[in-house]
Swiss-Prot record:
The keyword Transferase applies. The glycine cleavage system catalyzes the degradation of glycine. Belongs to the GcvT family. Its EC number is 2.1.2.10. GO terms for cellular component: cytosol; glycine cleavage complex. The keyword Chloroplast does not apply. GO terms for molecular function: aminomethyltransferase activity; transaminase activity. Keywords: Aminotransferase, Transferase. This is Aminomethyltransferase. It is an enzyme of class 2 (transferase). The gene is gcvT. Gene3D superfamilies: Aminomethyltransferase beta-barrel domains, Aminomethyltransferase fragment, Probable tRNA modification gtpase trme, domain 1. It comes from Paraburkholderia phymatum (strain DSM 17167 / CIP 108236 / LMG 21445 / STM815) (Burkholderia phymatum). Coiled coil: none annotated.
Length: 372
């Protein structure tokens, strides 16, 4: 049996009596007592997540921009100012998604990506292979000397500034998907990015691993509530944000996973997977579902792999949960083309075909329900 990996905050989670689970080979907190309360803290105040299992990778060299023009489906030509970030998929030649990631621009000779925990080794091997085979001459450096804390919620930024006062000057004017470096803090040099995976405002903070426990404790002292992977999943689902390995994978095109907006075909770039995407186009629609209630009560819970029956044929749920914010059972589903918001479909739950409404994603953003 392979031993689970630990983040630098592992002992802290144990001390907080977190319930730990195996997540992509990492021993991670699923909750610290009440997943619902952690979810609500992020929607109404501020919560924080240890996402140090994700991997920071630095890319340096003269041809780093050309490398990412080749590697990513989104266009790094959009990255022109230091700290600007871009969400993209990494595709294989068949147009399937190797991973989804965020890439940061720090200079013409320095880009940084943050990749998912379960795919980090695969991604780094793929990056190295492309670098070697196509002669980009880059230095590619995984940075396991860094940890990441995501602080999310309507009061998240103020509580970060209360914890690290001179981070305010560097980060107050940041727009979403921008980052700033903050030097000489009690927690070392921080990279503070206005990004997240919850549908709320906040920061994702890259911090030297040696200082992350002190930062975590200082944030908690300011009233930021620790939150686990359980709340992270219900929050991202409400926010209409995909999870790699569930909503897309090596065999699924971004065009069939609600991620067409991350594919830039406007520029004459021969990114890997482009030819296949252009040849095949989109074959399915990616939609939200809300299960109808039975006499005002939840009729069931929508879960991954349940069959969805539509007038146009069958589809499948990719992610599902009970939404604490909406008090509804919600899901993402991949369904035949032609299924539209407002349609009613039927989901096979055990031996019943239960009705569900098709909606446009997301369900919730910035604490507000957008559907229903």
């Amino acid at each position: 049996m392979t031993e689970l990996k630990h983040t630098p905050l592992h002992a802290t989670h144990r001390a907080l009596n977190a319930r730990m689970v195996d997540f992509g080979g990492w021993d991670m907190p699923v909750n610290y007592g009440s997943q619902i309360e952690e979810h609500r803290a992020v929607r109404t105040d501020a919560g924080m997540f240890d996402v140090s299992h994700m991997c920071v990778v630095d890319f340096t060299g003269e041809r780093v921009r050309a490398f990412f023009e080749r590697a990513l489906a989104n266009n790094v030509g959009k990255l022109q100012t230091a700290g600007k970030a871009l969400y993209s998929c990494l595709l294989n030649p068949q147009g399937g998604v190797i991973d989804d990631l965020i890439v940061y621009y720090f200079g013409e000779d320095h880009f940084r990506v943050v990749v998912n925990a379960g795919t980090a080794e695969k991604d780094i091997a793929w990056f190295n292979k492309l670098n070697d085979e196509e002669g980009f001459g880059l230095t590619i450096t995984p940075r396991r000397d860094y940890a990441i804390v995501a602080v999310q919620g309507p009061n998240a930024r103020e509580k970060v500034w209360a914890t690290v006062p001179h981070a305010r000057a560097a980060s107050e004017a940041l727009k979403p998907f921008n980052a700033a470096r903050v030097a000489d803090t009690p927690f070392g040099e921080l990279t503070v990015a206005r990004t997240g995976y919850t549908g709320e405002d906040g920061f994702e903070i890259i911090v030297p691993a040696a200082h992350v426990e002190a930062l975590w404790n200082a944030l908690q002292a300011q009233g930021v509530r620790p939150a686990g992977l359980g709340a992270r999943d219900t929050l991202r689902l409400e926010a209409g944000m995909n999870l790699y390995g569930q909503d897309m994978d090596d065999d699924v095109s971004p065009l069939d996973a609600g991620l067409a907006w991350t594919v830039d075909l406007s520029a004459p770039r021969e990114f890997i997977g482009r030819a296949k995407l252009e040849a095949d186009g989109s074959k399915q629609s990616f939609v939200g579902l809300i299960l109808h209630k039975d006499n005002g009560k939840a009729a069931g819970v929508l879960r991954a792999h349940q069959k969805v029956v539509t007038p146009n044929g069958e589809g499948e749920i990719t992610s599902g949960t009970f939404s604490p914010t909406m008090q509804e059972s919600i899901a993402f589903a991949r369904v035949p083309k032609g299924v539209q918001p407002g349609d009613v479909v039927h989901v096979q739950i055990r031996d019943k075909a239960l009705p569900a409404s098709v909606v446009k994603l997301p369900f919730v953003r910035n604490g507000k329900v957008l559907v229903g």
